[in-house]
Amino acid sequence: MTDKETQNENAPKKLSLQRRVKTTVAGGKVQVEVRKSRKIDTEAAKKAAEEAKLKAQEAAEKAAAEKAEKEAAEKAKKNAEKARVAAAVKKPEPVKVVDAEKDRIKAEEAELRRKADELARQKAEEQARKAAEEAKRLAELAADRETTEVSDDFSDYHLTSTYAREAEDEEERRKEGRGRGKNKVGKAKKGGRDDNGSKDERNADRRNQKDVKGKGKQGKKGSSAIQQAFTKPAQAVNRDVVIGETITVAELANKMAVKATEIIKTMMKMGEMVTINQVIDQETAQLVAEEMGHKVILRKENELEESVLEDRDVNAEKVTRAPVVTIMGHVDHGKTSLLDYIRKAKVAAGEAGGITQHIGAYHVETNGKMITFLDTPGHAAFTSMRARGAKATDIVVLVVAADDGVMPQTIEAIQHARAASVPLVVAVNKIDKPEANPDRVEQELLQYDVVSEKFGGDTQFVYVSAKKGTGVDELLDAILLQSEVLELTAVKEGMATGVVIESYLDKGRGPVATILVQSGTLNRGDILLCGFEYGRVRAMRDELGKDVESAGPSIPVEVLGLSGVPAAGDEATVVRDEKKAREVALYRQGKFREVKLARQQKAKLENMFSNMAEGDVAELNVIVKADVQGSVEAIVQSLQELSTEEVKVKVVGSGVGGITETDATLAAASNAIIVGFNVRADASARRIIETENIDLRYYSIIYELLNEIKAAMSGMLQPEFKQEIIGLAEVRDVFRSPKFGAIAGCMVTEGVIKRNNPIRVLRDNVVIFEGELESLRRFKDDVNEVRNGMECGIGVKNYNDVKVGDQIEVFEVVEIKRSI
């Protein structure tokens, strides 16, 4: 393989840089501009030139060596000639002939060596010349491969004239042609590294110009394989960043399309230390995003909720609606009996223990007009239910028993009505009783700013008897009169809104909610959003259990079809889109869960040290199940209020509906008692309760439930111990005994001195020793007790400093049971 072939094989196959080809259309005429695009095999030419230079250097070195050798040979020849001449002078003639022959032979050998060296030098020069010609040929071959291409990239178009471009091309050709000559070896010798260096610089400049100009498709075609480095964008891309109420650092980085470390660095500069998963608020996120040059769009998390709730029917006509009346008052003052008489139905007799357990909603017609009544419980435990009743109502009828007067729940009902800005109508009940005193009721209510019309106020007082029906018509007239003054109106046609009065879980029908419609008309098939729950209305029933297709303003109905049991007091709203209703319900559940977890975390942190300080506090774990949501709330609240510093009631679970297997398992795991209020346990739950020996209790009256829980808590209290003095003896004399030490001769002045009880020694009414007796004798006999007025000898254990005049006090420790 020849040197030429080796060079061709080692040369890069396709390393080329292209120059520009342009086509422009300007000024209404077609002007085709074609610039030659020159591809130069840069690396191959450069490598060939370097090899040629190296060979030329080698040839020069060889030539220098040959020259030195030649000079040495000539010098040796001259010396030999001198020696020969000298020898010819000294020696005789025959010897001269021999020496001349030897010198001739040596000269011929030197000449042969010189010729061989000359041939080698010529051969080296020929090889160097061929290498230079090969490099020139490669460069010319690259120049011959010039092509023309048409560019469609309008951004690369420049407005230089044709003459200017031709002049530019001519200048480039002239510069490139400077280094090209016939004698490449000589040029390599003379130019050295400087010429190549300047050529490399020119090539690099040309590549840079092409890289700057080469963009888009043309740039991709014209770029060399060597120039593949990634060029970072000179300017960051600014984006519109949508930020919710809270956002993590990682999410913010993702939205801004930057690394999370950049955000952390920025926040460190702003004086805030954060981690990648840390949640930051909307304001902080806005500052960070704006600091990094992005535009911020703030978004409310509940935007969907607001849009769903605002999507209502507008411009609907308002009509007069029936008043919603809530009956309030103290327990057993006759609220339900009064309502029962109004409804002409015997509902009140079914209430356990005379206490209204649920909030009931009924509507009645009188004198052609309709009134909706809400009945609230009067017991102290049902504060939250009364507050809900006042919120949903237009008029409050305050029932006060004429024989009882104003009681605590009466005052509370007045406060609820005031808080809700609802007018009062006072019904003084039980006026048929002999001990009734209606005037006293009016006087007592004056101190709570409830002034009757008789005293110049604006509150109507009506005297009624729920048993006999006395004054009931007057009460209804007073309610209708008050409603006319209020001018109650509501939109009848359109999407309904209302409030959940009560809710419970029915085993056969699922979640059931009693909803009081406040505006619009609720139809069967409507999509309803209630707090955390949603669903399509599958069925509606009135208070008598009859199916109804629709319910207008001020009408209470039972609704079936919700996804779960809503909380009493939740707002019920009809929406258009079931999918959006589901999203809103899930969003509300998530928010509630976050708030609950945050509250629990806060409570854990706050209680950590206090719990450590308190030590072990006795806990009574309770699981509460009731038939309706209102009862669950009332019982849980009442139980939590029973907690003391020593015994805490912990409600580990509560819910609406029967006692299930899950409840029983939870009770077994947490060692809790199960309380069922108007509900029962199913068969599977009963099996677990019997197996695990769980305490299960059923109640229908809240008084009994609270009293029994109190008793259970009392049993968990630490008992108190009290010291009772049972006897006192006065020391009259002191005897010394070798066996017992000091023996005190005493006279019992009070009570009984007992042998086995603890004693105290008093001197000048100050306790100086507390211990026990070692011996108690009457004369020489050991006795167990000595009564008042008798003498005895007393030996005090581990104490010999008894003196005359001291008193010995005997006491016993009595355990006292505590109660809550």
Curated annotation (Swiss-Prot):
TM stretches of this protein: none
Domain tr-type G: 320-489
Alphabetized CDD domains for the sequence: IF2_eIF5B, IF2_mtIF2_II, mtIF2_IVc
Subcellular location, record wording: Cytoplasm
Name assigned to this protein: Translation initiation factor IF-2
Region (G5): 465-467
Region of interest called G4, as start-end residue ranges on this chain: 429-432
Pfam families: EF-G_D2, GTP_EFTU, GTP_EFTU_D2, IF-2, IF2_N
Binding-site positions, GTP: 329-336, 375-379, 429-432
Family: Belongs to the TRAFAC class translation factor GTPase superfamily. Classic translation factor GTPase family. IF-2 subfamily.
Annotated region described as Disordered, given as residue ranges: 1-21, 113-234
Region (G2): 354-358
Gene name as annotated: infB
Region of interest: G3: 375-378
Annotated InterPro entries: EF-G-like_DII (IPR053905), EFTu-like_2 (IPR004161), IF2_II (IPR044145), IF2_N (IPR006847), P-loop_NTPase (IPR027417), Small_GTP-bd (IPR005225), T_Tr_GTP-bd_dom (IPR000795), TF_IF2_bacterial-like (IPR000178)
